[in-house]
């Protein structure tokens, strides 16, 4: 995905990230999987390390089919910010939580169905965690 697909990365941030060689969510994940990489990118771009970590977590979630922009934001608001975190969730509980959070914050047009969440969680269990803290 293009880097701008991550919620919160507009033209200004995208320009800074692209100048540092980060054009896609894959680039971001590769460069920022480790704390050292996030610190280096923060230094190079002037973007806070906290924000870079948030975006890296979203890029991590983008590895799951069906997760992108606003849905990654919704998952984060529901307490799931990484693939590693997603794999431990009970589908019915997560569905209730994202529905509740979306009703409250209106982050997505549509909340994924329970079967969709079940597939996402199953896929999360198969993916290797890539982010270190």
Segments the model singles out, each with a brief description of its role:
Residues 1-133:
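C-terminal extensions
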